[in-house]
Amino acid sequence: MPKGSSDKLYEITPGLELKVRPESIGGTPANRMIHRESNQLFIGPYVINEKGIVRVIPYSAMFGRPTANARHLSDPAGRIYSASMEEALYEIDVKSLAVTPLYRDEQDKTPGPKADLPGYHGKGMYSGQGRLVYANNGENSAEARRDPFIDSGVLAEWDGKDWKVVRRTQFTEVTGPGGIYGNENPATDPLWSIGWDAKSLILMLLDGREWHSYRLPKASHSYDGAHGWNTEWPRIREIGEGDDLLMTMHGMFWRFPKNFSLANTSGIAPRSSYLKVIGDFCRWQDRLVFGCDDTAKSEFLNKRRAKGEVAAPQSQSNLWFVDPEKLDHLGPVLGRGLVWLKEDVAAGTKSDPYLFGGLKNRALHLVHTGAAELSLALEVDREGKGIWEPLRTEVIPPNGYLFTGFKDDETGVWIRLVPSVDATGLTAAFTNKGDDERAAAGETPLKFAGISSVSDGESSARSGGVIRARSENKRNLHFAAKTTEGSLGLYTLSDTLTLTPETNPEELGWLEKHAAIPSREGVITTDAASVIYTDDAGKRFRLPRGNAAFDRAGPLGGERLCREVATERDLFNCHGTFFELPAENAAGFSRVRPVATHGLRIVDYCSYRGLLVVSGVDLALAGENRHIIRSSDGKTGLWVGAIDDLWELGKPVGS
């Protein structure tokens, strides 16, 4: 929304009272910066001083979707930069708020210079070491909306006169140790940018006016996609943990050292995996607050036959308040990344450094297509000081494959590979996984008590049915409840989480038709070996079987297989296991990630105002579980929680 919208600027009081600010002009902002000298917060088109007084920069003066702010190169006390997602660059006077366009937004028809950078969908921006660094993470083409592996995105720098491409691939955050304030010593403090390509995450470091690159593993592939829409805004931010910053990237919480520089590259480590899609976060009082993108209106490009007609009519995003201790206790750490992918590599070429420290259960897969055996030297930087030493040498058979694991006493911060001779078709893929201490699916955890189980007998207290959040700011959810004996009618879940029956045959009929659970015919089959999923292109994928009871429909009939509950990816519930399923434009089912295995008879699920809502409840088994919302007439109920509660169901298992 480059000209503003009906969206609001909100203020939340310490007592969690939500206030709509009258200065609201909407738009699609992702920028925030505190200007030290004037003690003002620049967030979106708003400028807020220490007394809470809000001033507004109209979109007529600063056209575009604001994505990032940065300290000025020559007048940091008096001006700041602001950039849009479509490559506009503006100067803002911090006192008068006068705006000077330096480069026009790509959607702006006003005459003026354009940056004309490669890529699309701007993200982070930061200044230091005599330059302004800007990142985008997409490509604006029909091909980019289909193929996640084309050239896309850019990391670029501007010296006050000219733009220069640093690296032609997808980048998001750009920041430094100064964080939201900007670097205290801009001439010497480092800058960091996080991005990715088809092989891995890419961390770029600007230190001593030179760029250096490092590779990290991906936990999730649902963030891939050449158009750049699937990431939202990964960040590296301070959360009150001293010199440890928090980085969010590709479904993993990362510990990121505030002193990361060329002289000290140690300290980066994964903390846990997550399913939410996070746009920003901060520490507030005793909680971390994550701004999340849950189900998107109409699902954008995330369509597939397995879902049927079930797109949310209105976005359901919200804030997620989390105890900081939980950062280390969500999903288990998982990582996959490559340094080469089917590439011809000259003898003596050193790969990018790949993260080696802070990971467990590490392994390396090597493939090449050369006619002779290939010797690869493995080298490590043991302390992150840039001093490399031999670890060992691996020899791949002619036109062959080699797997090797790493022992716990094979230590180092980074690892790199060096071929002894010219290599053809060389692939080097690293994997790692944390210790998954969750129990295998068995007794249902108390948090999920009351959700019907495959082991439950016939029960008159069992109910379920299709659910769907409503549109036009009604801020409620409709539920077509039924038991094994027939329909209970329509129920409404309010924004205060009360569930009440409603007499409205027309709405009930509409819901049962338009949120119907689609047939699994041609999508899911089973044989003696496994479960078989067939995607929209006819490709077949095999999944492990869970409890044999899932071979049959449940007591209440069909059960939801697939639905978007976090933006631009799906939650896939098949044969007793939840999976994170990337959109088709992020390579779809070939990049699926298992989450947890359960023995639950879940009829339907969706996101509602940031919550995960589940139908398929047996009130007789709910006890005092506060996650169960009981209807006012006592006949039915729904389970509510966060999507990341699902990790607690147990480790993925099957046969």
Predicted segments with their positions:
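Exposed low-complexity, polar/acidic, P/S/T/G-rich flexible segments that act as propeptides
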Residues: 421-454
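Asparagine-centered strand-capping/turn motif at beta-strand->loop junctions
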Residues: 366-370, 419
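Repeated scaffold domains used in trafficking and secretory/extracellular systems
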Residues: 26-38, 62-77, 107-130, 167-190, ...
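Blade-level signature of beta-propeller repeat domains, shared across WD40, Kelch, NHL, RCC1
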Residues: 276-344, 355, 603-655
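Entry beta-strands of beta-propeller and related beta-repeat scaffolds
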Residues: 39-42, 77-81, 128-135, 140-141, ...
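Exposed aromatic-hydrophobic patches
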Residues: 401-408
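Surface-exposed loop/turn elements that mediate protein-protein interactions on large endomembrane-trafficking
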Residues: 6-23, 46-64, 88-111, 142-174, ...
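Noncatalytic modules at the cell exterior or secretory-pathway interfaces
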Residues: 408-425
